[in-house]
Amino acid sequence: SVGFVIYPKQQKIVLTFGMFAGNKWDVPDDNCYQMIDQVIKEFEKEYPNVTIKYESGVMKDDYSEWLSQKALKGDLPDVFMVLPEDFSTFSSVGMLKNLDSYTKIDKAFKKSNYYEGSYDAGTYKGTQYALPYESVPTLMLVNKTLLKKEHIKMPGNHWTWDDFYKICQKVTKDTDGDGRLDQFGVYDYKWNDATLSNGGNLFNQSGTKCNLSSEPIENAILFTKKIERISSFRNLTSDDFDSGNIAFRPMTFSEFRTYKPYPWKINKYFDFEW
């Protein structure tokens, strides 16, 4: 006798994806669709019964309204990006799916693959509603040439506020004897930069409470003022840093990519090592 095994035909599935053009940090990004298209291509190859579609051309400034209108019409994409400023609202009104059950049963999923801070940003009241797509850390750029000139060792990865303050204090000076300061410690260092380096956060993990009156933020504000006092509260500009007259400058990684020579139109060149 001859036996036949009949397998059910795989059902065709269409998934919709919501995204905006560019990125959250407003720096040039020619690859936003290229990256998504590549991921879709690989996913559809692994799951040939699934087709993924998305609407291109939605700008970041219009994205929140576009997504909200989709929600009101009951036409939300199956998977979509969420801007940080919308996350708490969307989570609280039920627009986002609880992902905890999925992360627990997916053997390929590893929380350790994400930066802890980025992963936690997708948590609302103890529940995971989103996963990071892009993570952009803030870097501290260092003018190595200036530190070498002043016989100062490069700070290590575990440097402290006190180390930072002492270096800023040492490099800030009048180098040409005209009675005016022309070399400085740091440019564009804000209280929120100090807060993050001090383990503080502006909001609690669920985004429901502001921590402005907390001790870490209070200390960060006081430290920032202390740093500014070294340079007599001078209104410094990026040109001062570009000219090699400032030792430090905080900058996000996305800004850094377009600041140094990179395949964008915004290219800057320096006469010092950093």
Predicted segment positions?
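Extracytoplasmic/periplasmic substrate-recognition and gating elements
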Residues: 42-45, 51, 264-274
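Conserved N-terminal structural module of periplasmic/extracytoplasmic solute-binding proteins
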Residues: 1-89
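Glycine-centered hinge/linker elements that transmit conformational signals in sensory
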Residues: 167-168, 206-235
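Hinge/lid segment of periplasmic solute-binding proteins
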Residues: 58, 84-137
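Short, solvent-exposed loop/beta-turn-alpha elements that line the ligand-binding surface or hinge
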Residues: 100-114, 157, 176-177, 184, ...
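Short helix-initiation/N-cap motifs at beta->coil->alpha
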Residues: 56-66, 159-165, 233-243
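Extracytoplasmic/periplasmic solute-binding protein
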Residues: 124-133, 138, 162-210, 246
